[in-house]
Amino acid sequence: MPPGGVHRRPETIMSVASNLGFPRIGARRELKFALERFWSGDLDEAGLYSAAETLRARNWRLQVGRGISHVPSGDLALYDHVLDTACMLGAVPPGYGWSGGAVSLASYFALARGSRGTAAEQAAGIAPGLPALEMTKWFDTNYHYLVPRLAAGQRFTLTENRPLAHFRAAADLAIRSRPVLLGPVSFLTLSKTTDGSDPLDLLGALLPVYAQILRELAEANASWVQIDEPVLSLDLPEKTKLAFALAYGTLRNGPAPSILLANYFGPLGDNLATAAALPVDGLHVDLVRGAAEREAIVDAVPADRWLSLGVVDGRNVWRTDLRAALATLQSVAAARGTRRLMVAPSCSLLHVPVDLALETKLAPQVREWLAFADQKLEEVAALARGLDEGEAPIKVQLAASDAAMRARRDSEQVHRVDVAARLAAVTADMQRRRSHFPARRAAQQERLALPLFPTTTIGSFPQTTEVRQARAGLGRGQLSAAEYDRQIAAWIDDAVRWQEELGLDVLVHGEFERNDMVKYFGEQLDGFAFTQHGWVQSYGSRCVAPPIIWGDVARPAPMTVRWSAYAQSRTERPMKGMLTGPVTILQWSFVRDDVPRETVCRQIALAIRDEVADLEAAGLPVIQVDEPAFREGLPLRRRDWEAYLAWAVACFRLATSSVADRTSIHTHMCYAEFNDIMPSIAAMDADAISIETTRSRMELLDAFAGSQPAGGGGSYPAEIGPGVWDIHSPRVPSRDEMVALLTLARHRLADWQIWVNPDCGLKTRRWEEVRPALENLVAAARRLRADVARAPDAPAR
C-alpha cells in the first residue's frame, strides 16, 4: 500500500498507451561506441555516464512524442539489465572489489567481462584473472544475459535504488515514467548457485530488499511500477508457483506504487491461474504469442485489475495488422470495458532495431511491410486511440496498414509458385542417406584414408585487419573485384600451404571471403533483405543486424563452390566445404510471420541441399553444415519440443542427404546441453559432429557416451570431434593439455570415433595464437596415435 495506507489507482476512463522497454544501444549504436571508448581508455567514467544519460533522455522524449503515456524508466543498462539487478541487490561474488555501497564501474565490468588487471581494477581491489559471469540466452531470444552467481546463505542489500534514480531523472525532464525492474522470482530462477542449492530458497532473504525498493518509489510518488516476471512463460514446478504467491503477498503488504506484473515471450498456459490470483494491480500478457488464450485471460483476471494487452510484436520487425489488432482489443473491451486496459507491445522493444526511417536502401515494397521500435510506438498509440475513439480518428493509419497487408499477401515475390511446387515435391527418401552409417564410414575411409584421431579445424581462420579492409574496400568501390579476388586467392593459398606443413589431415579454405556465417548466405539467397542500421543488442557492446526473411527462399546460383573448389585444387588432401545449416540461418534472422517457421526452414534446407550437391560435384569429399543454433530453437515449453525437433532434424537431413556414401557430412554445434535432445542429435545422421568441450573438460561427452563401457563407443553412433582448444581465450594450450583432454575423451568414446579439433572457428583469434595452438593440436593427435600403435591390440581406423 502507498504511504498512509491509501490504495492508489490511476483514474482514467480511457485506455493507456504503454511501453515495456526501449532499445538501449541507440539508433546509431551510440552506447556501443561509448562503451568501447571507455574500455580503450579514450572516455572517462563521467563521459560514459553522460553518453548513457543523453541516450536515455532521447529515448524518453521520443516515446512521449509518439503518444506513449506509460514510459518505462530503468530499462537502459550499460551492459545487461540482469547484471544491473544483481549489482543493485548486492549479489556480487567475492573478489570483484565490492564490500558495500554502490557497485563501482570497475566491479560491474569485471563481472561482465572478467578482470583484466587494469589500473582501475587494481584500485578497486579486484582480484586479477577473474572470469566473467556465465552468459546465456535470454529465454528464446537472441539477447544474452549474465547469470547471477549466488550461494546458500546469500545476503542481499540495496546498494542503490536504480529504478528510483531513473524515475527521478525522468521527472527532472517533466516526464512521469513507470519504473521497471526484474521480479524477484524471475531473478532467482534465472540465477545459479555455486553450491548446487536451489536459488529460490533465498526468496525470504531477497524480499525485504524488493520491499525497500518499492517503498522508496512510493515515497517518491511513483504511480506505477512494472515488475517483469517472464518465467511465467516457462514450465514451472509447484514450488515456483508457491514462491510467486509468497513474493507478491509479501510485497503487497508494504507501501508500493501500483504494480503491473509483466509476462512475455509466450502464453501463460498453466501459470494463468497463478498469475491471475496474485495481489497486483495489473497484468501484462503477450497476445502475439499467446493469442489463443485471450478469452481465458478475460475470464481469469479479476475485473478490478488492469490488463496490459501486448498486441504489437516486440520481437519481430513486421508491421502490425492494425485492423486485426484493434479487433482483438475491442473484443476484450467488450467484455471488460476500456477503463482498465493498457495497449502495449508484446514485450520490451529491446529485441528490434530502433528506427526504420534510417533505412534508405531497402526495397520500397519490403520497407512498407516493416516497423522498428519507433514505428511500433506509433502503432501502439494509434491502437489505443482507435480503441477509445473508434476507427475514424485513425483511418489514415488503418488504410496504410490495410494496403501493406494486402500488398504483402498478394506479392508473387513473397509467395513463389516454383518454391511451393518444390516443397510439395519433397519425399521421405530425400531426407534419408542412401546407406546406414557403418556402410558410409567404410566408403569414406576408403576414399579419405584418414589415420586414427584425424585432425581438422572448424572452418574459419583469423579475419585480420587486411581481410576486413579488403572487403570494405570492395564494398566502397575502392578495390576492384579482380584485385579482391586476387587477394582472397592468395590468402587461401597461404592457408592451404601452412595447413599442409602443420600436418592437418582435413583442410579448410579459411572463409576469408565471408563477412558473417548467416549474412554471407542470406545475401546470395532470394527472399532475404539486409539493413544499414538494423542493429539489435546481443550482449554488452556486441550488436548484430539480423537478416530479414521477407519472402520465399531460393538459391539463384552457387554460393560457396568457387572458393571451396579453388582450395581443393591447391592440395591433394581432403578439403571441407563449409555451410551454415538451415536451422541456424532461421534462428539468427528476423523471420516472416505469415507462414510457419517450419516452412521457412524447409525452404532454406532446399537451398542448402542444392549447395551441398554442387560442392560434392566440385570434388569436395567432406562437407560441414554448421548448426550452432539447433538447441536455441527449442520452444520454452517442453510439450512443444517434439514438434520442433521433428522438423529441425528433417530440415537438416533434407539439406544433407543427397550425397553419396563416400561423401562425409560433418556438423558443428557450440556449447550446449545435449542430454535431453540426444536422440534428435543422433537422428540428424551426420557422419561426424564437432562440439565445444574444453571448458567442461569433456563432461559434455557423457551425453554422447551414454551407458556404454568406457572406450567402447556410446549412444552416439557416428564420429565426434570434441574440442581441445578453447578459442574464446587468447591462451595457447600445450600439447600435453590437449593429450590430457583427449585421454578423457577416450574414456567415453571409441578411438575410431574421435576427431581432434578446436572448440570453434578461429575467426576472432590472431595468427600468432592460431599457428602454435594448431601445431600442438597436431602433435597431440600424433602422440595418441603412437600410444595406440604401441598397444598389443592396436585398432585400425
Give the residues covered by each predicted segment.
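Domain-level signal for soluble alpha/beta catalytic cores
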Residues: 6-797
